[in-house]
Amino acid sequence: KELTISFSRDGVITGVRTAIDNNSYLSILRGGKSNLDTRMRREILKFVEDFRSYYVEKNATALEEIFSDDALIITGRVIKTMGKSQTDGISQQVRERVVYSKQSKQQYINNLKALFRSSEFVNVDFSDIELMRHGSNPNFYGVRLRQKWASQRYNGNQYADDGYVFLLWDFTDETQPKIHVRTWTPRRSGQEGDHSAPEDF
């Protein structure tokens, strides 16, 4: 892992975070199909890295500040159960079911606080990051990414999932951008990614 160091305009260190891997970072800066300038890409990537670190650091206060008060938040959990195989009716087979939940900002933050208090660690990795600008609102940006989540509670219970997150960021105030939408969908075999776009919300 590499570190990123953030500085204020006065040269004071304001943050030290683990970074996304260098290949992903350079790929995003080059731009691909998106219409974002390099400066804005750097700004968005900095906030995406900070956002990921807030989960790892179990920093509910920072997460609370980054979501707008009326944010649309859709979370999901993968529930695994054992059941008999439909083929032979005898052998055991793991079945997965996804449970979605639409939450207000306060519900989401309260649930995170409870999770953080009861968890020994939370590991979150972001990859396959894609940036896009809203078609009609130049201050809104969509970020699609793959998220791998792993956590372990103090009682030993573990949870892990692999899915896609879409974030709709409002950069009207570039020093304090707000997330208006956060959605999660599970990664399916053969799936390339989430197809959400800023104009969907």
Q: Where does each model-flagged region fall?
A:
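Short, low-complexity N-terminal intrinsically disordered segments enriched in polar/charged residues
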Residues: 11-57, 61, 65
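Short, solvent-exposed aromatic-acidic interface loops
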Residues: 16-27, 148-151, 180-199
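Surface-exposed, charged secondary-structure patches
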Residues: 1-8, 87-159
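Sec-exported extracytoplasmic/periplasmic mature domains
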Residues: 52-56, 68-72, 110-121
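A solvent-exposed, charged loop/short amphipathic helix patch at secondary-structure junctions
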Residues: 29-34, 81-97
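Short, well-ordered alpha-helical segments enriched in acidic and aromatic residues
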Residues: 58-86
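A short, surface-exposed beta-strand/turn
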Residues: 2-12, 20, 156-178
